[in-house]
Design a protein with these regions (language model features):
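Beta-rich, blade/repeat-based domains predominating
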Residues: 93-106, 137-150, 162, 182, ...
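Blade-level signature of beta-propeller repeat domains, shared across WD40, Kelch, NHL, RCC1
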Residues: 375-405
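Surface-exposed loop and turn segments in beta-propeller and other repeat-based domains
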Residues: 84-92, 193-207, 245-258, 349-369
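N-terminal twin-arginine translocation
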Residues: 23-32, 40-59
Length: 405
């Protein structure tokens, strides 16, 4: 089926797509929208350690007890929870949201956080702090490591939701304002290589269209695919130097199958080398959509009950964070889990959720068990198939390690 938005010259709609989905509404219930107060880089130099963290908050799942040491998961994919793995001194190395996680060639775990004290926190596999740095990326939302010519590079996605430096207190609803986001490529030690800004500069967005990117993936040939999941819901395709190629998606297609709703994450599926394609989360639809590398829609992976993020691949499986469960007709608070799918894109395990069930080949609605997570936002997998999970809106929780058993 041809996507009418898929070309290299066609501009996006003249008005920003309407965010009518309850995903966006729920996000705004938590995030305080308002006028932009200043540029991200001006804000970057403002440090506010006195109120950067609330260590008196209980960092527990909804069940109210620590899951440390418990065994979670189903079938061959079960894990022991190390709930204390990434904990640090919150007055020295604070986090707001553990938004993004990636592993470099040396096996270091790199976390991206939207703290105004440090945007990057670097761990070893034992949870020991190796480094913390950066304030230039106040809306840090996703981090990816790319191995290029024997060298590691960092791609950071700044989504534009930024801590308000003039916030009167540390209450969640008063902490944030929104501005445009951007993409940056860095050396592994944090030196800037280039940035990619608002698509209005390319003529593919109009000035009134929001741009708040949420994720990025690097294809085997070096091309970049960016999801504008908090903005106008397009996937934007660039070459390895950040030059525009095409875009597709949005919310105003004649064929609703081509729409994206809160397109939160993206990954390149290389499990079949002869059939590489993109998996793109349409989180508001509880769906992962399949596209060719040129943006042709190929089909959907429906994940009922799961407001799912982008895929992380390991071997024949992929792992995806679920930020909310759909329960009683709404997005349930503190209801996240991690879902794992096999090479046939069938769910084989839900970590922190109920066991997957298929009836006549159809996946039944999935949901949390409330025992482990609040809102799962990111996951990465090490060489031993252990998982590291970061969360959004989880009382400034550090990452959790899940040890494969």
């Amino acid at each position: 089926m041809q996507n009418t938005n898929l070309n290299t010259t066609q501009t996006a709609p003249s008005a920003a797509p309407s965010k009518s989905s309850h995903v966006d509404a729920s996000k705004r219930q938590f995030l305080h929208g308002g006028a932009t107060l200043g540029s991200a880089l001006l804000l970057a130099g403002i440090s506010n350690t006195s109120r950067a963290h609330e260590p008196e908050k209980k960092q527990l799942p909804k069940a109210g007890r620590s899951p440390h040491g418990s065994i979670i998961g189903h079938g061959d994919f079960q894990y022991k929870v190390d709930y204390n793995w990434g904990r640090l001194d919150p007055h020295k190395v604070p986090v707001e949201n553990s938004h993004g996680l990636a592993i470099d060639a040396k096996g270091r775990i790199i976390m991206a956080t939207d703290s105004d004290v440090n945007n990057f926190v670097i761990y070893n596999k034992d949870g020991k702090l190796l480094d913390a740095w950066g304030t230039q990326y106040p809306g840090a939302h996703s981090v990816k490591i790319s191995h290029e010519n024997g060298e590691d590079f960092i791609y950071i996605v700044d989504c534009g939701w930024v801590l308000d430096r003039n916030r009167p207190d540390n209450q969640w609803k008063n902490k944030w304002y929104r501005q445009s986001g951007f993409i940056a490529k860095l050396t592994i030690d944090g030196k800037l290589v280039y940035t990619i800004g608002h698509p209005v500069t390319l003529g593919i967005y109009t000035p009134d269209m929001r741009y708040q990117p949420t994720d990025l993936t690097v294809a085997p040939n070096g091309d970049l695919y960016v999801t504008d999941g908090y903005g106008s819901d397009f996937v934007i395709h660039y070459d390895s130097n950040g030059r525009y190629i095409r875009h597709w998606g949005g919310t105003n297609n004649a064929d609703p199958a081509l729409n994206l709703v809160n397109t939160h994450g993206v990954g390149v599926d290389t499990r079949d080398p002869n059939n590489q394609h993109l998996l793109v989360s349409s989180r508001g639809e509880q769906t992962i959509k399949k596209y060719s590398m040129q943006g042709k829609w190929l089909g959907d992976i429906h994940l009922p009950g799961a407001y799912v993020g982008g895929p992380v691949f390991k071997g024949e499986h992929f792992y995806a964070p679920v930020c909310w469960s759909h329960i009683d007709g709404k997005m349930a608070a503190n209801s996240g889990f991690i879902t794992i799918l096999d090479k046939h894109n069938r769910v084989v395990s839900n970590l922190g959720g109920l066991a997957p069930e298929y009836v006549d080949g159809q996946l039944q609605p999935m949901q949390t068990n409330y025992q482990v997570f609040n809102h799962c936002h990111c996951v990465c997998v090490d060489d031993d198939e252990n998982l590291y999970v970061g969360q959004w809106n989880a009382n400034q929780m550090y990452p959790i390690k899940l040890e494969r058993v």
